[in-house]
């Protein structure tokens, strides 16, 4: 009888204890769990959650210092030291402010959004992307040219926030500490320095619409994007701790700065001043908020972007460094592509300089480098998979400038290069034999 009762006794499916050995046994479909196992699971989940919270780079103890931020940017972005220092300090202060405002204090620190000014292809977007990657925070890129004032055809400014929420997997709390990069911000400048009489829905109107979210407000975001309508549900997001980085080329602002710097005088004794010998990069260093107003940004908008960071146009030396030095440099990427076919790829120093010169001539900066290399490599990348005796390709200056074929190193006729997989097997076999 006792044996029969023992068989019928209920046990925890995880630890094996019977119902008499535990306080409570909870039944599920064909499974049982005791209160002790539930408590243990709860502790494990809590420890993991605390571990993730502690490792957050935004906590005061883990927040990277400006020097550490700059060192990280140096790995991916060539040159622009002044811009990297300014960005590192601004980002450090922003997240330090978030941690400080959590505490009960009389002094509330205000947000300092950032305005990046620099020519096309100088690294504005890459700097913002790299910062977000380092800090492990949600990041979204928006194009200011697609935005219009509410009620007109185009995107509402709230759609920018939706991109950030989506990139945070709809975790609103995490999105509220993210970074938003608004590109082409110079394209929403009003058409003249004076206030417009007619409605400027894609210029001044967008600036007005952006004011609140830049400063910090609780915005209502449609979960599916598009226009708002009264009967839909909204996601509420507070933008007070979102860092906004706006970037633009601001073509022509150098003339405004130059004009401000050269005061002309009238009369026979007047000093005749020639055109400034400074280049665009040097002139941008002298930028003042008043220059942005003359360019067409409204005073309230300029006031919400207090940190002005200028980037210089990239010269030949900087572009060659961009091709070769960063962790994910373009030359390294193409060498890896060829390596997958077991072919060695080399670029001569003259070829790299020729690629950089072409990018400068096209006025595309670093952004145009990939297009130039892709044009050059198209034929050889087409031929290599079929011509199995090629083991090395060297890109020369003539390949870039005159579109001549690369210098190829081939195996004797009839021989075929081994595949990467075969070569690895042969190497492993040789290592075993010599061991």
UniProtKB/Swiss-Prot annotation:
GO biological process: cell division; proteolysis involved in protein catabolic process
Disordered, as annotated region: 401-435
Family annotation (PROSITE patterns): CLPX_ZB (PS51902)
InterPro entries: AAA+_ATPase, ATP-dep_Clp_protease_ClpX, ATPase_AAA_core, Clp_ATPase_C, Clp_protease_ATP-bd_su_ClpX, ClpX_bact, P-loop_NTPase, Znf_CppX_C4
Gene Ontology CC terms, in alphabetical order: HslUV protease complex
Record flagged with keyword Protein biosynthesis: no
Binding sites annotated in the UniProt record for Zn(2+): 12, 15, 34, 37
Domain ClpX-type ZB: 1-53
Coiled-coil ranges per UniProt: none
Listed GO MF terms: ATP binding; ATP hydrolysis activity; ATP-dependent protein folding chaperone; protein dimerization activity; unfolded protein binding; zinc ion binding
Binding site for ATP: 119-126
The entry's keywords: ATP-binding, Chaperone, Metal-binding, Nucleotide-binding, Zinc
Family: Belongs to the ClpX chaperone family.
Function statement: ATP-dependent specificity component of the Clp protease. It directs the protease to specific substrates. Can perform chaperone functions in the absence of ClpP.
PANTHER family xrefs: ATP-DEPENDENT CLP PROTEASE ATP-BINDING SUBUNIT CLPX-LIKE, MITOCHONDRIAL (PTHR48102:SF7), ATP-DEPENDENT CLP PROTEASE ATP-BINDING SUBUNIT CLPX-LIKE, MITOCHONDRIAL-RELATED (PTHR48102)
UniProt-recorded name of the protein: ATP-dependent Clp protease ATP-binding subunit ClpX
Lineage per the UniProt record: Bacteria, Bacillati, Bacillota, Clostridia, Eubacteriales
């Amino acid at each position: 009888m006792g044996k029969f009762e023992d068989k019928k006794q209920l046990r925890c499916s995880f630890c094996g204890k019977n119902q008499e050995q535990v306080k409570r046994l909870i039944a599920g479909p064909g499974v049982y769990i005791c209160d002790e196992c539930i408590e243990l699971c709860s502790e494990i989940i809590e420890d993991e959650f605390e571990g993730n919270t502690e490792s957050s780079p935004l906590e005061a103890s883990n927040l990277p210092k400006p020097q550490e931020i700059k060192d990280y940017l140096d790995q991916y972005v060539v040159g622009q030291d002044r811009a990297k220092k300014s960005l590192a300090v601004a980002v450090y202060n922003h997240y330090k402010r978030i941690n400080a405002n959590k505490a009960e204090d009389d002094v509330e620190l205000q947000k300092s959004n950032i305005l990046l000014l620099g020519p096309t292809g100088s690294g504005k977007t890459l700097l913002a992307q790299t910062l977000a990657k380092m800090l492990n925070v949600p990041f979204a890129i928006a194009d200011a040219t697609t935005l219009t004032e509410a009620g007109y055809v185009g995107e509402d400014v709230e759609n920018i926030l939706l991109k950030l929420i989506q990139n945070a997997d709809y975790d609103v709390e995490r999105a509220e500490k993210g970074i938003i990069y608004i590109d082409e911000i110079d394209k929403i400048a009003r058409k003249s320095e004076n206030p417009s009489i007619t409605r400027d829905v894609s210029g001044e109107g967008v600036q007005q619409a952006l004011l609140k979210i830049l400063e910090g407000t609780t915005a209502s975001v449609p979960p599916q994007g598009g226009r708002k309508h009264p009967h839909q549900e909204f996601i509420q997001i507070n933008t007070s701790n979102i860092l906004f980085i706006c970037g633009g080329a601001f073509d022509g602002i150098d003339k405004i700065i130059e004009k401000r710097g050269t005061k002309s005088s009238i009369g026979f004794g007047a000093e005749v001043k020639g055109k400034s010998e400074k280049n665009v990069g040097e002139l941008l260093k002298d930028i003042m908020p008043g220059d942005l107003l003359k360019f067409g940004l409204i005073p309230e908008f300029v006031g919400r972007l207090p940190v002005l960071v200028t980037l210089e146009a990239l010269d030949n030396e900087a572009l060659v460094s961009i091709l070769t030095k960063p962790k994910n440099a373009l030359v390294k990427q193409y060498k890896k592509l060829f390596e997958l076919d077991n072919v060695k790829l080399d670029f001569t120093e003259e070829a790299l300089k020729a690629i950089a010169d072409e990018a400068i001539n096209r006025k595309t900066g670093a952004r145009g480098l990939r297009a130039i290399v892709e044009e050059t490599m198209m034929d050889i990348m087409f031929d290599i998979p079929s011509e199995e005796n090629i083991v090395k390709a060297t890109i020369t200056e003539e390949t870039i400038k005159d579109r001549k074929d690369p210098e190829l190193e081939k195996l004797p006729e009839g021989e075929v290069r081994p595949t990467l997989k075969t070569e690895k097997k042969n190497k492993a076999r040789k290592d075993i034999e010599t061991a």
